[in-house]
Amino acid sequence: METLILALLATPLVFSLVMAFLPKNTSYNVFAGLNLVSVAAVLVLSIMAAGDVLMSGDTASALGLWFHLDSLGAIFVLLIGFIGFLTGLFSLPYVKADIEEGSMPAERAKQYFALFSLFVFTMLLACLSNNMILTWAAVEATTLSTVFLVGIYKNKTALEASWKYAMVCTAGVAFGLFGTLLIYANAADVIPNAHEAAFLSCVLPYADQFDPTLMRLAFAFIVIGFGTKAGLFPMHTWLPDAHSQAPSPVSALLSGVLLKSAMLVIMRFYGFTIQAVGAEYPQLLLLIVGTLSILVAALSMFRQDDLKRRFAYSSVENVGVIALCLGIGGPLGIAAALLHCVFHGFTKTLAFCVSGNIQHAFGTRSLAKIQGVVEVAPATAALAILALLGLGAFPPFGMFISEFLTFVAGVTAGPMWLVVVVALGLTVAISALARIALKSVFGHAPQGMGKHEAPALMLIPEIILAVMILWFGIATPLPLVHGVETATGIVLEQSTEELHATPMYRAVFGTETAQSEVE
């Protein structure tokens, strides 16, 4: 298993370096092929390593204490593997179309594909690192690897977006470093072997001995710092600009995986904080941040004429849902948060990829100018409707399950007024998505505009994504359910019997536990 983990980390890094040292005049097909091999290898290795951990519930380490893979990390490693591969496949025709249209010079393909693999590497590093300082560095490195992808078109708005992304995230994540160092200093005073104070798996058993005052301060900095990277309000200001200006496959990776990787770090420290100060403080903080993220994002969606900016604010709203689940707490809240990370990751990846089809067909992202997608690109229109229904959390899509469990957890544990407020916010967000369907997808195409369907190689990964988000809702894979249950126990440091005893949870996933079915 150690070899698998190291190979998983090394593969995208090595391919990125190989592409970086190739001459600029190397054929586009060489760069595209190398990147596809890179993300395909990452997918296979992630299934072999993380899939085994999810099925068994065991943990694995590499390089001593430096890298650690448990069920919590395995969920996100698989998310990176699948979405990285599908967006990598989608990138082949997408970037080629950009080059043919003149929006990207041919020699810039080298930069795109080298940074794409590097981006995958930095996210894997953030999820697999067991050293809290290295984890922070990996999250910071995701900024460095993506800032040039955001600005790759090098027009004024793209460069402004990349500059804003770099400044806001670098400044925000610095708060995360301060919180991390406070936890490290706290741990060094408590654990028997001070040289192990930076390693998460070594520190967690002693978290209940940490200084409560320092931990409250540290967790506040953690939420501000890594919440900036996750796109939580009020640190979300970089996200709409970066998502709208980046190439659509990069937007899909940013929203589908990067935001979730930052939330994983918050979940790790959330578990520490609960052990040190109890659940009330971290839950209250995340309830406030999550609720405000949902409300602000939902209201902001209506004001966006740019299709990708509207989807970007939808990402802020859904990260808010994840934070809200953590704020509600308890086994059901944590399980709902983890499921929402997975289901939203795949659904939003589909949405951003489809937005790329639409942008290439109409030559614009302006919703005022995008009308009659169903007439211009019927297959794209069908996929767009599936993505919008999925984002609206309608049955039988996966996000229906995670949001349903969120409301069950909220009604069970939280104040009823909060549940009502959040429900109103989500309704507003659904209305903003419905306007895309009614006016853009089903409207009448501009006069004289002919058919402009996306090529098959762009449609194939989108069809796979559409099938997956339906599969998650109709028959959620038992290994995923089992992994979520085990990961919930890791976050809370307690048994998940309470989760199995919840009637609504049993109604969704069956009366038998996922673990017993897997075994």
Q: What are these language model-derived features?
A:
Residues 110-113, 253-260, 458-462:
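Select subsegments of transmembrane alpha-helices in polytopic membrane proteins
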Residues 27-39, 160-172, 377-381, 456-464:
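Alpha-helical transmembrane segments and their helix-start/interface "positive-inside/aromatic belt" motifs
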Residues 43-53, 177-185, 394, 472, ...:
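C-terminal TM-helix exit segments that contain a strictly Trp-centered aromatic cap at the helix terminus
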Residues 140:
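Short phosphate-coordinating micro-motif centered on Lys-Gly-acidic
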Residues 1-5, 28-34, 63-73, 105-113, ...:
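Membrane-interface helix-boundary signature
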Residues 1-7, 14-114, 489-490, 512:
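Transmembrane helix-loop-helix hairpins at membrane boundaries of multipass inner-membrane proteins
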